[in-house]
Structure formats: structure tokens, C-alpha cells
């Protein structure tokens, strides 16, 4: 039992929360060529990446310079990408936000036919005074495989009541 816990709600650090939320909202609403400047929202040694991959290990891009390079790659491979149905959630830590959203656009990976990619995403943002320290993206990797015309194995789940 937590009888010594003092409930604060999310009324603490109001200005810090506002500043951090503004950064998260800006990140999620950046489109087109403006994506080439999104790395400016990070601290110098910040990182971002995809935490759900076909290998089971995250793809982590570390540092502003590498994040800038990643933006060039991303714009080439996902030229018209946009996030939508964006919902931003605060946590008990004013420096940690979660986002749930959908995303869609062309997918142009070398070696694969052009595809159209749609998925549902979760993003974790850890921030420091309005700058992103770490952004982790989570999605259903099978949807990306389908968009690339890669056959997806089917799992038999007999007996699950639906």
C-alpha cells in the first residue's frame, strides 16, 4: 500500500511540460523538406530510432550529425510520409511523453518494388528542457514487410476466442 504517496497529478513542472510537449508536437507534425531539420530538436548526443525490427534489435541513430544523415535517407525512402491521428500523452515524469498515431506514405527501399506503407505507431520521447534525448519508435514490422511485398508467415492461433 502506498499510503505515504502524495498524488500530484500532472500539475507539477507546468512550464517544463509545456515546453517538452511543444517539441513533441513539432516533431510529429514535421513534413516534407522540413524533416531535414528535425534533428535540431535533439540534444547534441541525442538518439532516435526504430525499436521494433525484423532482427529483434533496435536500429539506433546517435548524435545530431547522424540524425541529420538519417533525415536525408528517410526523406529519400519515405518521400511523402506523414503522421496523423496523433495523440500525445504526458506521464508522471515531465520529461517523458508517449505518442500514439498512425502513419502513411510511399516506401522506396532499394531492392524492393515501390510500395505504399501504412502502420500504427507508438513513440516514446525522453526530453531535457525542450530537447529530445531519446526517441523510440514502435510499430508492427509485418505491415512494413507487406508494403515491401515481402511474404509474411502466418501464425496459427487455434483456440483463441475472438
Swiss-Prot record:
The keyword Secreted does not apply. The keyword Hydrolase does not apply. Induction: In liquid cultures (aerobic), phz2 operon is induced by quinolone signal via 2-heptyl-3-hydroxy-4-quinolone (PQS). In biofilm (microaerobic), phz2 operon is induced by quinolone signal via 4-hydroxy-2-heptylquinoline (HHQ), a precursor of PQS. One of its GO terms (biological process) is phenazine biosynthetic process. Keywords: Antibiotic biosynthesis, Virulence. InterPro entries: NTF2-like_dom_sf (IPR032710), PhzA_PhzB (IPR004964). Pathway: Antibiotic biosynthesis; phenazine biosynthesis. Involved in the biosynthesis of the antibiotic phenazine, a nitrogen-containing heterocyclic molecule having important roles in virulence, competition and biological control. PhzB2 (operon phzA2B2C2E2F2G2) has a role in the biosynthesis of the phenazine during both planktonic growth and biofilm development, and in host infection during biofilm development. Homodimer. Belongs to the PhzA/PhzB family. This is Phenazine biosynthesis protein PhzB2. It comes from Pseudomonas aeruginosa (strain ATCC 15692 / DSM 22644 / CIP 104116 / JCM 14847 / LMG 12228 / 1C / PRS 101 / PAO1).
